[in-house]
Each structure stands twice: as C-alpha cells, then as structure tokens.
C-alpha cells in the first residue's frame, strides 16, 4: 500500500514514523515554512524535516493548484492519511486515492467535529475524550468510523498534555485502521444527529474574569495551554497561568475574588473565585521560565492577601 501523508504538526510525528516502518510513503503534503523567533527566519515544521531526512517528496503549496495535483497523481498513491493539517480538501483531490482517505481526529466523533477538539473537551470540563480514525468525506469530520479509543482527562491536564497523549496513542490505532481497510472494512457511519462542533480558539479566552467559578477558570487555563495562555495582573505585573486545578466549595466567601487566600504545598496556590477555590499549579512571569507553584511562592514577596485583577477582554 502506497501512502500519501498529510500533516503540519508535531502531534502527527509518531504516526508518521510508525507508518514509515510499515508502509511505503510516496509523498508528504504539509504547510509552507513559517517565520519563527526574533529573527523571523523561515522554519520547517517537524513533519517536513522528517520527510526530507527520509528523502520523501514534499509538497508545501499555499494552494493545491492543478500542477500540484498532477504531481501527486503521478506518484500513484493508494491512500491518503491526514493528521492535523488544517485545510479542507475538494473532491477532485480526494478522488486521486483509489483506496480512499483517512483522518486521525482527536475526539470521540461525532462529538467535537472541527478544528479544536482537544481544547474544547478541556474547556467544557470533559472527563473522557478519545481518538477516532475516520474515512474522509466532503463534509468535515463526518466520515465512517474505522477505529475509536477512549482515554481519561485528568482535572489538571492541559491541551498540550492531551496532544502528547494523542500523539503516543495514535500510531497503533492507525495501523489497526489500515489493516481493516486492507480487508475491505468500510467503517461504521456516524450518528450525525449527535454531532457537536468546535471552532478556532480566540485570543480573548486568555482574558480571565475571577467572578467565574473555579471550575470554569480552571478549564480555561488548561485549555489555553499552549495557546493563547490565560493571564492576569498581580499589582502591576502580568502573570501567565499554565496549569490549574479547582475545588468548587466556597471557603472564603468574605474574601475578594481574585485574592490569593492560602498556600498548600500539596495542592497549590489558592485563589478565591466567584464560586470555589482555584488551585494555581504552574505560572510564569513574562520572559521568564515556567515555575511550579512552590517555586513561585518561595520566590515572591508576601503573596497571601494580594489580589489578581483581570486583564481586559471579552468574557
């Protein structure tokens, strides 16, 4: 089976490596190089770097024009495997692959069709999510289900944590799906009536309101890591929140929302909210390294009684 691989993200790297061990990859489609760092030098994504190292033909066009389509067609690929590319394909392109096209989607489809399934699951406080290997259809994320696997989301897991988990779990699921396809399995249709949808995260999610419940704030902090990252002001300094947990019991009703009310070396830095206690676990001052809550507490002047204020934005 000749496979054409499509991705632009680190989350797909382990799948790419595993496919290379078991199948012939005849080409890779990825996004163009992007400016990165202070010097804004063009940087290749990890998929492109790996493909070039393995001497695999790479395509990175802004648009899939006829010349690109013909070049891909000339490779005689049997199947296309897509994992985190970020663009929708037309029927003309999908029809190139005689054995069809499959996609790795990090949710339990039909839940969270769209571009931010990991972040959306955390933002909504889900305790369980998963990975779906689906056949591709013209309607986004509506294809037949080939393989699904559930996993738990811990209360303090971030989007980055779950992305790494998905990266590690996906290779074996993709191999299972390819084996099923080789035996003629067409997959199980989704129940479209149960479909939910998710869109791109907005930068405004990083603007926090401490009048929200600790559950909502915790979800937002963890969902927004690594982007856009939630922040608040402590006196006149920005503090970036990277990880949090919560306790939705009101112990400090008489204290201000946003006030640092306690420190527990086992649970975190306690911040009062509109409902319950937010446990800050990892924080950062702009331009400095990320600190666990103990290091932040020990390295700061008296924190108890100081109040976080919201950075302006849309709630």
UniProtKB/Swiss-Prot annotation:
The record lists (6S)-5,6,7,8-tetrahydrofolate as bound by: 107-110
Keywords tagged on the record: Protein biosynthesis, Transferase
The domain of life is Bacteria
Q: Output this protein's name.
A: Methionyl-tRNA formyltransferase
Q: Give a yes or no for keyword Acyltransferase in this entry.
A: no
Q: What is its EC number?
A: 2.1.2.9
Question: Which parts of the chain span the membrane according to its record?
Answer: none
Q: Which organism is it from?
A: Borrelia garinii subsp. bavariensis (strain ATCC BAA-2496 / DSM 23469 / PBi)
- Similarity comment: family membership: Belongs to the Fmt family.
Record's GO cellular component terms: cytosol
Its encoding gene is what?
A: fmt
Q: What InterPro entries does this protein's entry cite?
A: Fmt, Formyl_trans_C, Formyl_trans_C_sf, Formyl_transf_N, Formyl_transf_N_sf, Formyl_transferase-like_C_sf, Met-tRNA-FMT_C, Met-tRNA-FMT_N
């Amino acid at each position: 089976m000749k496979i054409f691989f499509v991705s632009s993200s680190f989350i797909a790297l382990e799948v790419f490596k595993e496919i290379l061990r078991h199948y012939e990859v005849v080409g890779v489609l990825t996004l163009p190089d992007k400016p990165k760092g202070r010097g804004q030098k063009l940087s290749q994504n990890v998929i492109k770097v790996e493909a070039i190292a393995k001497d695999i033909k790479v395509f990175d066009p802004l648009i899939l024009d006829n010349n690109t389509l013909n070049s891909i067609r000339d490779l005689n690929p049997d199947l296309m495997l897509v994992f985190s590319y970020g663009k929708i394909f037309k029927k003309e392109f999908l029809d190139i692959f005689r054995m069809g096209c499959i996609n790795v989607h990090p949710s339990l489809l039909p839940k969270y069709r769209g571009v931010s399934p990991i972040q959306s699951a955390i933002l909504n406080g889900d305790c369980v999510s998963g990975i779906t290997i689906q056949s591709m259809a013209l309607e986004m994320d509506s294809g037949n289900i080939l393989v699904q696997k559930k996993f738990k989301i811990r209360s303090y897991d971030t989007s980055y944590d779950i992305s790494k988990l998905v990266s590690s779990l996906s290779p074996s699921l993709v191999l299972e799906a390819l084996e099923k396809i080789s035996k003629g399995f067409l997959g199980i249709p989704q129940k479209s009536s149960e479909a939910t949808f998710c869109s791109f995260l907005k930068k405004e999610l990083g603007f926090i309101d401490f009048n929200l419940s600790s559950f909502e704030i915790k979800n937002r902090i963890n969902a927004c890591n690594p982007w856009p990252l939630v922040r608040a002001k402590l006196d006149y300094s920005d503090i970036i929140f990277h990880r949090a947990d919560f306790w939705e019991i009101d112990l400090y009703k008489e204290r201000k929302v946003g006030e640092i009310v306690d420190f527990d070396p086992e649970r975190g830095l306690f911040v009062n909210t509109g409902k319950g206690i937010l446990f800050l676990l990892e924080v950062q001052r702009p331009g400095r390294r990320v600190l666990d809550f103990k290091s932040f507490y020990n390295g700061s002047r008296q924190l108890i009684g100081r109040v976080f204020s919201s950075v302006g934005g849309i709630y």
